[in-house]
Amino acid sequence: LEEDESAAASTMAVSASLMPPIWDKTIPYDGESFHLEYMDLDEFLLENGIPASPTHLAQNLLLPVAELEGKESASSSTASPPSSSTAVFQPSETVSSTESSLEKERETPSPIDPNCVEVDVNFNPDPADLVLSSVPGGELFNPRKHKFAEEDLKPQPMIKKAKKVFVPDEQKDEKYWTRRKKNNVAAKRSRDARRLKENQITIRAAFLEKENTALRTEVAD
């Protein structure tokens, strides 16, 4: 125990003998010429008689602050995991694309003209019937595309013939015969127009019956 105490006392004496040379050095300060300089730690320890014990910490003390910060930033960047090159999944992009697709689905298609739609119907009317249903000197009646006015499809009242008025032969003058001819022409024209319309409606109805049957069969299938 006495040997340990004497060794500690001798060590403290050596340290005490080393202190004055370190702190006796004064740094002149006049406000302008004062500046800090970096010094090699080994030279500093050797100059003051202190045995050098090089460690990782002592080596860092020799480096300027800027270099230390550079090393720290480099080490932190090296330690950080590399950024993935895969594109980041953005939920907002998915939502916007979904909304745009839904809007496209909701868009109503352009209306189709029913007159342009043709149904495959096996309908071949008699050419003679088509002639009877056509206006003389006009185009041949087409039961597939012909359209009637609303007035044409209304039920027509029954026309009663007027009672015949007996006219004596001595009263049948030129004026009488002229009026009678006009009435006969008008009556014939009315009968022909009525018969033409009836023929057209009949053939058109026959075609619509065929078309209706074909559509019902297609829907059922």
Curated annotation (Swiss-Prot):
One of its GO terms (molecular function) is DNA-binding transcription factor activity, RNA polymerase II-specific. GO terms for cellular component: nucleus. Keywords: Activator, Biological rhythms, DNA-binding, Nucleus, Transcription, Transcription regulation. Residues 175-195 are annotated as: Basic motif. Residues 72-116 are annotated as: Disordered. It is found in: Nucleus. Residues 196-203 are annotated as: Leucine-zipper. Residues 173-221 form the bZIP domain. Pfam families: bZIP_2. It comes from the Eukaryota. Residues 73-100 have a biased composition (Low complexity). CDD domains: bZIP_HLF. InterPro entries: bZIP (IPR004827), bZIP_sf (IPR046347), PAR_bZIP (IPR040223). Induction: Accumulates according to a robust circadian rhythm. Gene3D superfamilies: 1.20.5.170. GO terms for biological process: rhythmic process. Belongs to the bZIP family. PAR subfamily. Transcription factor that binds to and transactivates the TSHB promoter. Binds to a minimal DNA-binding sequence 5'-[TC][AG][AG]TTA[TC][AG]-3'. Binds DNA as a homodimer or a heterodimer. Can form a heterodimer with DBP. This is Thyrotroph embryonic factor. It comes from Phodopus sungorus. The gene is TEF.
